[in-house]
Amino acid sequence: MNGTLDHPDQPDLDAIKMFVGQVPRTWSEKDLRELFEQYGAVYEINILRDRSQNPPQSKGCCFVTFYTRKAALEAQNALHNMKVLPGMHHPIQMKPADSEKNNAVEDRKLFIGMISKKCTENDIRVMFSSFGQIEECRILRGPDGLSRGCAFVTFTTRTMAQTAIKAMHQAQTMEGCSSPMVVKFADTQKDKEQKRMAQQLQQQMQQISAASVWGNLAGLNTLGPQYLALYLQLLQQTASSGNLNTLSSLHPMGGLNAMQLQNLAALAAAASAAQNTPSGTNALTTSSSPLSVLTSSGSSPSSSSSNSVNPIASLGALQTLAGATAGLNVGSLAGMAALNGGLGSSGLSNGTGSTMEALTQAYSGIQQYAAAALPTLYNQNLLTQQSIGAAGSQKEGPEGANLFIYHLPQEFGDQDLLQMFMPFGNVVSAKVFIDKQTNLSKCFGFVSYDNPVSAQAAIQSMNGFQIGMKRLKVQLKRSKNDSKPY
């Protein structure tokens, strides 16, 4: 369909095809044209119809293409979420069609670094014109008007931009430059925001480092709530983008290898999933959730609704990650998620079973479990009191509260076993079985709680937990009435 006489047959090259929703099903193309032409000449309108009906009926949405990009953007600013059409309950939804997103400017825009400061825009165009049609070329200049030695080049397609990167990146060293030319996709707004957040967090960490508290991630306890939320947000964005370099640039994470960073990203993604899960499903209750158990030692029942946030309480447990000097566990991420989203431990634990499985799977990817770190995570007095009677004891709890644990590390003793299972409830006994002839551990033991709920929480969190090259097997001890003890 052609435009009016004062317009060419085709829209401008940078025109945008817009998708428009929340349109009355009774409206015709004429009605829509009258609406849109208030903002500029319309090239084409295409109403989406249900072809299964006879005659085909409108689906209540359409595509519209203006002759100019400016008209499309003006229409979007005036209509999107602003105007409710007759007979509709919600405002118009107007945004670029998916086909336009696939050719977004950010997908075609290149950053060119390490160029000679003598180069002009025309020189850059000549240099890159062989790879395709250039939509825009701009050299970055300082307040004095002099080149900063870098530029932006936007091609009409992403394929052209990719070809230019392959051919030109580090292909030559220009006059006055100390290293080869850099050609890469320009940072998107999301990339810029992520870098800004990382810089803010790095500055805060450096201040803490000056006080020598950054020996490990236990220093997170001294961070204010806003920075804990920032930390989790950075982890979640990194997890979704797959860019682990941002994590490795942070001071306390510099010693982590790629696998450890991936585990961190997996934990962040899982924490994000738990945070976004509707709380009404109640697939796992607060009392049985590993998250609630791991965070319960540091928070009161009312802490999730309190306006004052205690960073230590919200973080919960922290322990070593795969033998590195810094690490996070599910409890700590749950605490940060609580700060970030206004959820307490109970809010996170009311997620679906699949969410908790994702958390457990991500958490079990951590290669080592440092039981020696646990005393610092929980109340030392409580640990001492329980250690007196529980370690080495074979006292049993009520039915359903007694656990059998396989695949313990050879070096684990009664105290280690107690420390590892204390976070899930009151332990009445913890015993590692020893070979009487060799005086070495048989690599299995028993743990008894004073209630079945704690035992189930321990099974959910610790069954399959990896220690070194083995995974723990945690299950209920058989009843006394059974012929076999386990």
Curated annotation (Swiss-Prot):
InterPro entries, A to Z: CELF1/2_RRM1 (IPR034196), CELF1/2_RRM2 (IPR034198), CELF1/2_RRM3 (IPR034199), Nucleotide-bd_a/b_plait_sf (IPR012677), RBD_domain_sf (IPR035979), RRM_dom (IPR000504)
Pfam family, one: RRM_1
Subcellular localization: Nucleus; Cytoplasm
PROSITE patterns (alphabetical): RRM
Tissue localization of expression: Expressed in skeletal muscle, uterus, diaphragm, lung, spleen, testis, mammary gland, adipose, eye and brain (at protein level). Strongly expressed in aging liver (at protein level). Expressed in lung, stomach, heart to very low levels (at protein level). Expressed in germ cells of the seminiferous tubules except in the central region that contains the elongated spermatids and spermatozoa (at protein level). Expressed in Leydig cells of the interstitial tissue (at protein level).
Keyword Thylakoid: no
Residue numbers carrying N-acetylmethionine: M1
Induction conditions: Its RNA-binding activity on CEBPB mRNA increases in response to EGF.
Biased composition range(s): Low complexity: 284-309
GO biological process, one term: regulation of RNA splicing
Superkingdom in the source lineage: Eukaryota
GO molecular function list: BRE binding; lncRNA binding; mRNA 5'-UTR binding; mRNA binding; RNA binding; translation initiation factor binding
Protein keywords: Acetylation, Activator, Cytoplasm, Isopeptide bond, mRNA processing, mRNA splicing, Nucleus, Phosphoprotein, Repeat, RNA-binding, Ubl conjugation
Positions of the UniProt region annotated as Disordered: 277-309
UniProt domain RRM: residue ranges: 16-99, 108-188, 401-479
Modification Phosphoserine, positions: S179, S302
Phosphothreonine: residues carrying this PTM: T4
Family designation: Belongs to the CELF/BRUNOL family.
Domain text: RRM1 and RRM2 domains preferentially target UGU(U/G)-rich mRNA elements.
Role description: RNA-binding protein implicated in the regulation of several post-transcriptional events. Involved in pre-mRNA alternative splicing, mRNA translation and stability. Mediates exon inclusion and/or exclusion in pre-mRNA that are subject to tissue-specific and developmentally regulated alternative splicing. Specifically activates exon 5 inclusion of cardiac isoforms of TNNT2 during heart remodeling at the juvenile to adult transition.
Protein name, per record: CUGBP Elav-like family member 1
